[in-house]
């Protein structure tokens, strides 16, 4: 939740309008999802998320949501999958990585499940140590 807190602080500092905190159905569902997840269980529901992003980013984020809990994939594999779905011969893993990096709903849209081509843990907004911890938590969930 710390990563969400930092992002909320950045948003609050950059808002021109008055910021008012209130509980909404989406926030309530996201909180419930996170409570289940950090309680060590794989949530059996997805909050009704509507992240803002380009059509390409939306496609990549949809792929991220299809990566099973406790498993990882590579940027290259995501690029191949998206290229196949679009009927293209290939797609840039770097472009996919850029879209993954713009995911602002980390954990629920599981960008932490994407690793480098050699299986190494690569960039994560919350830090590599947090990415490793999330993957360990998921391994325990799926045993």
Regions found by a protein language model. Give the residues of each.
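Nucleic acid-binding interface residues in structured DNA/RNA-binding domains
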Residues: 32, 36-143
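Compact structured core domains
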Residues: 1-46
């Amino acid at each position: 939740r710390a990563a969400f807190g930092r992002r909320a602080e950045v948003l609050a500092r950059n808002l021109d309008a008055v910021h008012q905190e209130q509980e909404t159905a989406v926030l309530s569902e996201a909180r419930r999802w996170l409570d289940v997840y950090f309680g060590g269980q794989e949530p059996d529901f997805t909050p009704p998320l509507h992240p803002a992003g380009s059509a390409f980013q939306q496609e990549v984020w949809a792929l991220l949501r299809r990566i099973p809990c406790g498993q990882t994939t590579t940027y290259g594999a995501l690029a191949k999958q998206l290229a196949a779905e679009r009927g293209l011969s290939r797609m840039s893993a770097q472009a996919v990585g850029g879209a993954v990096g713009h995911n602002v709903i980390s954990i629920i849209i599981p960008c932490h499940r994407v690793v480098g081509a050699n299986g190494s843990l690569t960039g994560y907004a919350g830090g590599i140590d947090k990415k490793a911890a999330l993957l360990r938590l998921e391994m325990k969930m799926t045993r």
